[in-house]
Every structure is written in C-alpha cells, then in structure tokens.
Amino acid sequence: MLCHGRAADGRDPRGDGVSTVDEIRAQAREVAAGWAPPDAPQSWQLTAALFGVIAAHEALLRRLAELPSDRLPALLASAAVSFLVRRDRPMPLAGYFPEPGRPQPGFDAGFFPAARSFVSARLDDVSAICQERRYQMNEVARCAQIALGIAATASPEAPVALVDLGTGAGLGLQLDRYRYLVGTRSSGPRAAALTLSCEARGSHLPPRAGLPPITERAGIDVSPIDLEDGAARAWLQACAPPEASALARLDAAVKTARLHPVNVIPGDVVDVLPGVLDSFPAGREVIVTDAYLAVFLPPERRARLVGILAAAGRGRRVTWLSLDPLVPLGPSGRDSVQGLALPAQLVRDYQRHGVFAALGARTFDHGTESGRLLARAHPSGQWIEWLSPDAA
C-alpha cells in the first residue's frame, strides 16, 4: 500500500530487492496511520492496531526482512496473522476479528498483548505463510473510484474493452455489475448484489459513474486467484481489512465474479499486455486500469508499459487509469508514477500526511497523448476528492 526507503525514481537504493527492518517498520507504521485519521470509524481500529503490533515486533520484522520487497512484507504479515487467527480461532485474539455475516466485534486495549503473544508463539507459522504466499489486495471498494475515472475519460456510449493489471481474483473486471453511491448520486444496476458507497469530498463533484458498454474484459496477474478454490478464497479473505463491511463487500463481489467468469491471464503484466491488446477488435476503445501496481514496477518496466500503451494508441483510443499511492514521491517529487504533474498543494498535503492516493488518466488516442490528474482518493475506496481541471 504505502512504502518508504526507495529512491525518488522508485529504485531499491541497495539493488538487492529486499527491505530493511527499519523500512518494513516504516511501512507498517504508515499503513497504521492511514487507518487512524481523526475521523476514522471504529471499525478501522483493528487494522491500525494490527499494523502497530507488526511495526513493534522485532523478531517478526527480522523475518520479514528476508523477503523480496515486491512481496510487500508488512501487508503480507498482516494477512498471514489474519489467516491463522480465522483458521485456528485462538482466544481471546479471535474475538476481535469479524466473521462473515456478523457485526464488527468491539475493540479494547486487550488486543495488543493478545496479538503480541500470538505472533511470538506462532512466529514460524507466520513466517512460513509469508514465504509461500503473495499478498492479494482485492479491495473492491476501489472500483467506485475507478468507475468515476472511466466515466470521466471514456467516449460516451462507445463500447470499450477493459483490462485490469494485477487483477488478482478479477473483481475489478466486474465493476459494471456493481451499484455505486457517491455522495448523493447513485448509478449502476439496481439489482446489483453489491452497492459501493464512496464519500464525495471537496467542492468539485465527480461525474456520475455511468459506464460505457464493456464488450471485452481481461485481467493479468502474476498469481491469479481461482475463485472456485476454497483455500484460495480463504487467503483472499485474509488479505481483506479485518472489517465486517470489507468482508461483506468481498463476499458479494466474489459471488458476482463466480457468476460471471472472466479471462485472467497469468504472467508479468508488461510481458502479457501486448498480446491482450492485440486480441481486441480493431479500433475498439480500451480502458487499462491498475490500483497500486504501477508504483511497484521498476522504472524501466514502467517505461516499457507506457511504450506499449502508446504503441497500441496509434490505431485506437487507449486510456490508462491508475490509482497511485504517490510512492516514491520523496521530498522533492513533483510527478505521479504515471508521470503526471502534481498540484503543489497536493504534494504538501501528501508529505505532511501521506494517507491518500491519486487517480490519474493518460490517454493515447490515434497518435496523440494527453494526461490529467483526476482526483485524490482514500487508499481503500472510502472517499474521493475530485480536482478541478486547473488544479495544477
């Protein structure tokens, strides 16, 4: 989600592909801070507290420092702990974690000693899970933000092909099958199994999330999730924030995806993308989306990604929508990972607080290119603040 310890261009400064204990501690602390703003709902306390425990557990941090940095060690550890707690139900710790279909349990200071003791006692198990698995963040609430980006950039009424990079279980490819409530506006199928609510902040209203017809859809992921596999679904659940509402969203989205299977191609997104784009009908408009993926690509791979999109955009309209956590922005950074100029106030706000993302769009349209920063957004889809066109 949020990472420190990288150079301003995103490179690992040591070049060894791993993070130090201090870097992982900073990652965990930053995630904890992101879930503990002054206006945070009570249901966020557990997530913030869990990452606080991870940040303070020296033995766990040393184990995590053995992992490649692209495995997102702090996030992976939180999922491993959640997985074991949900599977084994150790008390009293399990009493703090929500169960599907039930209300959010209460939270108190007893969580901290219970969690510390559990991590210490099960350190080998937590470490083994982190060695074996990858973190899969399928926060379907982000679809509300992505849908607004599509509504703002796609050609009205024209059919589009949708490609989701790092799609995991492919839940983001179902976004036209969800209903949205953004501020006081609603859109999407009335009979949808899932309604996603997103607070609209600021003085500029985002567009209504009316989506064009999606005629083709494909996802790419290095480790796709088979939703027909119960063990895979259990891991996906462990990667969700430990909130009753997040589990309910995930359950509804998984049911929707199982009813409407999509094509998810295994492999590196940069290697696989050209073939996917070539598979669509000639001239078909394409929307390519990613949420927290491009930031973790090495700079040369990001440049290759842009080159692929630009090449495809010589004969069709291709729009790349990205939710970017603005990492690694650094103290002197002024551009997003997409290469879009950031408003000075947004940079200052990020450097002070660092708990929001940027939604940006780059469009390659028959040889011409344009780009625009659309909004700032909560990392897990809770709110969006649309920016005016002259915000920069």
Regions found by a protein language model. Give the residues of each.
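A short SAM/SAH-binding and catalytic strip from SAM-dependent methyltransferases
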Residues: 286-299
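Class I S-adenosyl-L-methionine-dependent methyltransferase module
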Residues: 67-69, 87-90, 94-121, 132, ...
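A short N-terminal interaction module
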Residues: 12-125, 129-136, 140-146, 160
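Short amphipathic alpha-helix with an adjacent loop that forms part of the alpha/beta core around
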Residues: 273-281
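A short, conserved alpha-helix within the catalytic core of class I
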Residues: 297-307
